[in-house]
Design a protein with these regions (language model features):
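C-terminal motif of bacterial Sec signal peptides marking the signal peptidase cleavage site
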Residues: 18-21
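Bacterial N-terminal signal peptides that target proteins for export
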Residues: 1-9
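Predominantly extracytoplasmic/ectodomain segments of secreted and cell-surface proteins
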Residues: 23-171
Length: 171
């Protein structure tokens, strides 16, 4: 009877040890963090122009015209990953208002978030395509990796003509 009890006890301990050894690994979920992140596409969704015109009576007037996709006046953007710059080679018209621009960004698969650096501070703002951005000066836009520990910073410039088309400028 004691041998049977000892045999049953040993069998129970070995079985329990075998079952418990499997529990540790399956309860842990492993995640792979990718450091590669990039902005892969940028386009302007909406931008305003301040159009100057002369009325029939000879007075000057200004009205605002909003350009949206798929306007032919909205340029494409070049993304230079080596120099970390984004810019338009075809300048926007002179009367374009760069202070409130809606843009759309596409990012690589493993990008965790996109943030825009403030104009007067190092504060970062989460990018959304529904918030306008002031591009009167070049802006830094950061694409972070999936766990937000590393980022790639791009210097984004929206170019516009410096003088009105068809005007003569003397220095």
């Amino acid at each position: 009877r004691d041998k049977r009890f000892l045999y049953t006890l040993c069998l129970t301990i070995v079985s329990s040890w075998g079952l418990l050894s499997c529990l540790g690994d399956s309860a842990t979920t492993e995640y792979t963090i990718y450091d590669e992140t990039a902005i892969t596409h940028m386009e302007i969704l909406s931008i305003n122009r301040k159009i100057h015109t002369t009325s029939k009576s000879g007075g000057d007037s200004v009205y605002t015209k909003t350009l949206t996709r798929p306007s032919k006046l909205l340029p494409g953007f070049t993304i230079d990953h080596e120099n970390k710059t984004i810019y338009n080679t075809d300048s926007l018209p002179y009367d374009t208002d760069l202070s409130r621009v809606l843009i759309s960004l596409s990012v690589s698969t493993y990008t965790g978030g996109v943030y825009v650096k403030g104009t007067s501070s190092d504060e970062l703002y989460y990018y959304t395509s529904t918030d306008s951005i002031d591009f009167t000066t070049p802006r830094e836009i950061r694409a972070y990796n999936s766990d937000l520990t590393k980022y790639r910073a791009y210097q984004v410039t929206i170019n516009k003509h410096q003088v009105e088309a068809g005007s003569i400028f003397w220095e």
